[in-house]
């Protein structure tokens, strides 16, 4: 029997998909800009 693949961890979630990580790269900033343009309430994890 295999275990469930999603093991929630807030720290890992923020490190991999967080706002500061998005701001770090040009591509990440583009993601945030796209989400702002779309009117997302939450921009990142």
Curated annotation (Swiss-Prot):
The keyword Ribonucleoprotein applies. The keyword Ribosomal protein applies. InterPro entries: Ribosomal_bL34, Ribosomal_bL34_CS. GO terms for molecular function: structural constituent of ribosome. Disulfide bonds: none annotated. Pfam families: Ribosomal_L34. Keywords: Ribonucleoprotein, Ribosomal protein. Gene3D superfamilies: 1.10.287.3980. GO terms for biological process: translation. GO terms for cellular component: ribonucleoprotein complex; ribosome. Belongs to the bacterial ribosomal protein bL34 family. This is Large ribosomal subunit protein bL34. It comes from Paenarthrobacter aurescens (strain TC1).
